[in-house]
Amino acid sequence: MGKELYDGFSEARDLFEQANDYFKRRISDVMFYGTEVELMRTENTQPAVFLYEVIVASIQKTFRPDVVAGHSLGEFAALVLNGTISFEDGLNLVLKRATIAQKVCEKFNTGMGAVIGLSDAYVEKRIKEIGDETGELIYFANYNGPGQVVITGSKKGIRLACKAFQRHYA
């Protein structure tokens, strides 16, 4: 994730290296060579996505929007890109957010999953059914938009729900 940007753009390379220095570890190596398991750990996912978003927008030399916006984690990239906060402040905030989320997931054995391509009503109905059938906790976390929701709950509940939704091509 992002290796072609690192190799192809000096500005991207500089931002990757700034992030590596700030995090005191090579997040770029996790992004370029990490396993799926490593990339799925929120302590890696959130900084990686933030960094990728900032880099992709930063190398767009001819595209300078008047307004930027972001949703959830994307808000931090938007704040950096519109100059509200510095890149380093964005790294700091995202690292704190990711660390807290990782600790909560580990302490409470919880997780989350994005469900894309199914109606909100169907997802809502199925997570209730799966929860009732298994006793596992499964909840809606976000309605991101039509046909895209985030569910949260016990890791087992999320796995069961994701399997059920994959059978319906989500």
Regions found by a protein language model. Give the residues of each.
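Alpha-helix C-terminal capping segments
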Residues: S58-K61, L79-I85
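Helix-rich "cap/lid" substructures immediately adjacent to catalytic or cofactor-binding pockets
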Residues: M1-A69, I151
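Gly/Ser/Thr-rich helix-start
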Residues: K3, T35, H71, E75, ...
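An amphipathic alpha-helix/helix-turn recognition signal
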Residues: D14, A48, S72-L73, I85, ...
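Gly/Ala-rich beta-loop-alpha elbow adjacent to hydrolase catalytic centers
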Residues: E53, D66-G74, A78, S86
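Alpha/beta catalytic cores of group-transfer enzymes, especially the acyltransferase/condensing modules
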Residues: Y22-R25, N82-A170
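Glutamate identity and glutamate-enriched acidic tracts
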Residues: E4, E11, E17, E36-E38, ...
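Short, glycine/charge-rich beta-strand/loop segments that flank catalytic centers
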Residues: E36-V37, A69-F76, A98, T110-A114
